[in-house]
């Protein structure tokens, strides 16, 4: 089963990379800044998805490496800092939504806010995993990190 799963995920990596390249090429030909930004954002997400799929393949093959103590220390500091940044961004975007009347602008702001909320939930899950410093299997990492992310499970 894992061989078939790895093959399927590998195909998904190729699709995400093709999608990213296609969107990047198209956005380079567009003059409207908002359209360009939205297309670039989707292309970036496709590259991110391909990267995450590669990590899944590594995990399925049993090739993932455990974190070192130095990595735990660095991650603890970095994650704590970024949790605060995400909280500030969520508050700032929520304030903008309240004062902006144009629904098109609000749509973009809500899109950004949704991303910030997902980032915040992921960072909290990562922080929990880093703080535990227990021997955690790769699939336990997935559960710890993703359990509070809306719409994931």
Task: List the predicted regions and their residue ranges.
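Non-heme di-metal
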Residues: 1-153
